[in-house]
Amino acid sequence: MIARIWSGESPLWRLLLPLSWLYGLVSGAIRLSYKLGFKRAWRAPVPVVVVGNLTAGGNGKTPVVIWLVEKLQQRGVRVGVVSRGYGGKAAAYPLLLTPETTTAEAGDEPVLIYQRTGAPVAVAPERAAAVKAILAAHNVQIIITDDGLQHYRLARDIEIVVIDGVRRFGNGWWLPAGPMRERASRLKTVDAAIVNGGVARAGEIPMQLAPGLAVNLRTGARCDVAQLSNIVAMAGIGHPPRFFATLEACGAHPQKCVPLADHQTLAPADVQALVGEGQTLVMTEKDAVKCRAFAEDNWWFLPVDARLSGEQPDKLLQHITSLVR
């Protein structure tokens, strides 16, 4: 229903317009207060790069963060990552991730980024506190914040927006009548707009999510996902249909697709109940970090990597590395 409202297919969005106007006025006033200096943002002693969205819902932001961290690491840059830690609840904040940190404490995306990149990762509702925790424990040269475009309390040097190239901005309205956290005109002020799928427009960086080999959660064995049979697909991400379409494109044809809420807590019994005798469970990598501790032999995940095309990605990386002292 939400997808139909935000796309404009359902007329119910009109009933939510008063709340959307209120949301837009409040969010605009907050941004203006920082822009005019009525409120002060905290500036870190190292450059800060924000990777965020203008819309609610999954746009492919986490793969972009991983891509950016890995590309900077390849250039010899010491990178730290901060996040709000959605879906997690730590005993105390800021929380600096360790190999023992669970998704229940830090959230699924921070744990995934930590495991994929090995970069220092910290979570806190107040992102400045997370930055300070990393700087106190690690000699990093740059901070990447996973989400937080609208978190103006943290000053930033580079802003990168990730856009779903198929859904783009839906009906164009602020939450809750539409998907917008800020108006599309905000694109004029960011440093880069990366478009996941669909057709990129002038000045935007095209991106595709490239699937790798399926990985067994228990053994680490790898195989072409099309070789798996009797698949039940599970996706607890911002836009589950994207994952199901990826499986189809890879030649894997699920018998059943189970969409879950983004950052949803997964109980062992609930996940086990999805898979019948002789079936194979295939999930996203973000779900896998929550399920690995209780995984069965026939559970697999399909990793995806961001692939950015054209000359603009290299120019963006050069611009970012030029800020590093």
Swiss-Prot record:
Keyword Lipid metabolism: yes
Pathway linked to the protein: Glycolipid biosynthesis; lipid IV(A) biosynthesis; lipid IV(A) from (3R)-3-hydroxytetradecanoyl-[acyl-carrier-protein] and UDP-N-acetyl-alpha-D-glucosamine: step 6/6
Binding site for ATP: T55, A56, G57, G58, N59, G60, K61, T62
Record bears the keyword ATP-binding: yes
The EC number(s) this enzyme carries: 2.7.1.130
Pfam families the record matches: LpxK
Catalytic activity: a lipid A disaccharide + ATP = a lipid IVA + ADP + H(+)
Keyword line: ATP-binding, Kinase, Lipid A biosynthesis, Lipid biosynthesis, Lipid metabolism, Nucleotide-binding, Transferase
Domain of life where this protein originates: Bacteria
GO molecular function: ATP binding; tetraacyldisaccharide 4'-kinase activity
GO cellular component annotations of the record: plasma membrane
Similarity annotation: Belongs to the LpxK family.
Function: Transfers the gamma-phosphate of ATP to the 4'-position of a tetraacyldisaccharide 1-phosphate intermediate (termed DS-1-P) to form tetraacyldisaccharide 1,4'-bis-phosphate (lipid IVA).
Name of the featured protein: Tetraacyldisaccharide 4'-kinase
Gene that specifies this protein: lpxK
